[in-house]
């Protein structure tokens, strides 16, 4: 997917707020959905500043969709005022949970973190470090471990990771245009094979 580069560039030098945020969503069908709901239920155990969202503010419960017509509450990377409401808080940390856990499967749930210079506290692709700098990512396995991790966070943790946050931000911007990458891949394939 393509991302909103202009919006992402607004985060290049933004001041950060010591906070962790999280978006649960409404779906509860597969492993990642179930984990998000269990995490949401743990909110009362979080001792640092935080903001838990059950769903995006622009999600229409009557029509079960967003204004952009997407029937999923998460939609495309950083699109819609609901998502911007989440990222404009400038939180240092965000709990990012993929729908499922597979080696090379990662989505806007972590890419949005990189594009906004937010440290992802992440459950998802085990080999995300093959694509992004793992030192700018905090991993967790279940909701109980997540609560422990969050409650030990300090603002200094963010600043200690700053170099890796910047690397992941640059990589996300470089990889932002999905269709351009496909075009470059096809061009390279044609050239290599003399087609």
Q: Residue ranges of each PLM-predicted region?
A:
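C-terminal anion-handling pockets and recognition modules
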Residues: 161-168
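Nucleotide-sugar donor-binding catalytic core of glycosyltransferases
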Residues: 1-139, 157, 169-193
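C-terminal "capping" alpha-helix adjacent to the active site of nucleotide-linked donor transferases
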Residues: 143-159
